[in-house]
């Protein structure tokens, strides 16, 4: 089984850049964001990120990566709580946004199209595990 939780990804506010991991900065209209957290507040791991990244590559969808600084608490998703009760591989993805949860929330129109295309490709894919091997079959 596979899961695709899809919360939004807050972009660092100009005055709060200290909260993001150095060198990782998603951009609006830069593609779908794969979210990582060293304290496991997101479900993404190396395998799920690699599989989802390959699905996106085959679908022509750009991918960005984001990680919170592990020493500063940030948001989380329900995905990691759900995965604790059901054995499925999951990857947390979203769209880069400014002013999340405000009346002026802003995201890119291209990113919305990218996420739709990524979700279509994900649900049209067959991900098979055989021991340590993973086989990915996607519709052409």
PLM region spans:
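Active-site-adjacent substrate-binding region
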Residues: 4, 8-102, 130
